[in-house]
C-alpha cells in the first residue's frame, strides 16, 4: 500500500505531466501555424510522451492500492518566439521537471518505499535524456542559424 503522502505527491506529478503534455501540444500548434511541420511533429510526440508518463504514474498508484486523480491543470502559454526561444524554454522546462521528479524520489526515500523509489528512478533516468535532447536541439539551432533552421525542422520531423 502506498502512503497517502506519496500518493498525493505522485498525483501532483500526474497533473504536472498533463500540464507538460498541454505545453508541448501548444508549442506544436504554434509551429504548425508558423510553417515548421517538423518541429510541430516533434512537439506532438513530446506531448504524447508526457501524457504517457501521467498514465504510468496513475497506473502505479492504483496497483499500489492508492487513488489516482487529476487536479486542476492550469492554462499553458500560447505565444512563442523563434524556434531557438521555444527550445530554450523546452530545456528549462525539462530541468524543472527533473527537479520535481527528484523531489518525488526524496519523498519515497523518506517514506522508506523502495518499490516507489525503483519506479521513479526510471523517470530520473529519462529526465537525463530529456534534458540532453533539448540541449542538443538548442545547440544545433544555434550552430545552424537562420539558414539551417529548415534542415533542423526536417530532421525533427523524422522523430
UniProtKB/Swiss-Prot annotation:
Q: Signal peptide span per the entry?
A: none
Uppermost EC category: oxidoreductase
Q: What are the inducing conditions?
A: Expression is induced in the presence of excess iron in an oxidative environment but not in reduced anaerobic conditions. Is also regulated by oxyR.
KW Oxidoreductase (keyword) present: yes
Could you tell me what reaction this enzyme catalyses? 4 Fe(2+) + O2 + 6 H2O = 4 iron(III) oxide-hydroxide + 12 H(+)
**Record EC number:** 1.16.3.2
Sorted alphabetically, the Gene Ontology cellular component annotations on this record are: cytosol
Any one GO MF term held by the record is: ferric iron binding
Domain Ferritin-like diiron span(s) in chain numbering: 1-145
Q: List the GO biological process terms.
A: intracellular iron ion homeostasis; iron ion transport
Q: What are the UniProt keywords, alphabetically? A: Iron, Iron storage, Metal-binding, Oxidoreductase
Indicate whether Oxidoreductase appears among the record's keywords.
yes
InterPro entries per record: Ferritin, Ferritin-like, Ferritin-like_diiron, Ferritin-like_SF, Ferritin_DPS_dom, Ferritin_prok
- State the protein's purpose: May alleviate iron toxicity in the presence of oxygen.
Q: Which family does it belong to?
A: Belongs to the ferritin family. Prokaryotic subfamily.
Q: How does it assemble?
A: Homooligomer of 24 subunits that assemble into a spherical protein shell (12 +/- 1 nM diameter) that can sequester at least 2000 iron atoms.
| UniProt cross-references to PANTHER family, sorted A to Z | BACTERIAL NON-HEME FERRITIN, FERRITIN
Q: What is this protein called?
A: Bacterial non-heme ferritin
Give the originating organism: Bacteroides fragilis (strain 638R)
Amino acid at each position: 500500500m502506498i502512503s497517502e503522502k506519496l500518493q498525493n505527491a505522485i498525483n501532483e506529478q500526474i497533473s504536472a505531466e498533463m500540464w507538460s503534455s498541454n505545453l508541448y501540444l501548444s508549442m506544436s500548434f504554434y509551429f504548425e501555424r508558423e510553417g515548421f511541420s517538423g518541429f510541430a511533429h516533434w512537439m506532438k510526440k513530446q506531448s504524447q510522451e508526457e501524457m504517457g508518463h501521467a498514465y504510468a504514474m496513475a497506473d502505479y498508484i492504483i496497483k499500489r492500492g492508492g487513488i489516482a486523480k487529476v487536479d486542476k491543470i492550469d492554462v499553458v502559454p500560447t505565444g512563442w518566439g523563434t524556434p531557438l526561444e521555444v527550445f530554450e524554454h523546452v530545456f528549462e522546462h525539462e530541468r524543472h521537471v527533473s527537479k520535481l521528479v527528484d523531489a518525488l524520489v526524496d519523498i519515497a526515500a523518506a517514506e522508506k518505499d523502495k518499490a516507489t523509489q525503483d519506479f521513479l528512478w526510471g523517470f530520473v533516468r529519462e529526465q537525463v535524456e530529456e534534458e540532453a535532447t533539448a540541449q542538443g536541439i538548442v545547440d544545433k539551432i544555434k550552430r545552424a542559424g537562420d539558414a539551417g533552421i529548415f534542415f533542423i525542422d526536417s530532421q525533427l520531423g523524422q522523430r
